[in-house]
Amino acid sequence: SFPTRRSSDLVTTEDFGSVLFRFDDGSKGSFSVSQVSAGRKNRLTFEINGSEQSVAWDQEIPQQLWIGHRARANQILSDDPGLMNRDVADSAHFPGGHIEGWPDAFKNMMGQFYRAVQAGAMPDNPQFATFHDGASVMYIIDAIVKSHQQQRWVRVEY
């Protein structure tokens, strides 16, 4: 049975959204957001599927990366810094098996930002969100809204 309504307040925000997208190279994708999935709280998952492999990550078990294969056994990679590529191993602050997650990602990003400020120069390939990144997200959101309003595919205009 369903619980009784706890409040008579009318909710006027979007509770669920689903977006279809396609890239210039023809590849397609989708994503969904929900504020009504009971028990999921702030869950964030990514899954990318290709013809030969898939990869999935779940914020509720952030120390694991699942890799699915078509022709061999699937894999679950763990977060052991000793096994990571040197480019990303510095972002792991604890030994393998200890959970690092959402707050750690922001700590790592801000650490990179502060190092750039201290150096007085923007890196060629910044490892933190830039104003350009934020603007790009806003252009994408604008295209999603226009697509919904016009009920057709809309190109993201930068």
Residue spans of the language-model regions?
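Short, small-residue-biased leader/transition segments that mark boundaries at the very start
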Residues: 1-7
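C-terminal helix-rich "cap/oligomerization" subdomain common to oxidoreductases
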Residues: 58-61, 98-101, 108-158
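Residue-level marker of intrinsically disordered, low-complexity segments enriched
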Residues: 2, 74, 86, 138-139, ...
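NAD(P)-dinucleotide binding in Rossmann-like oxidoreductases
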Residues: 9-17, 22-108
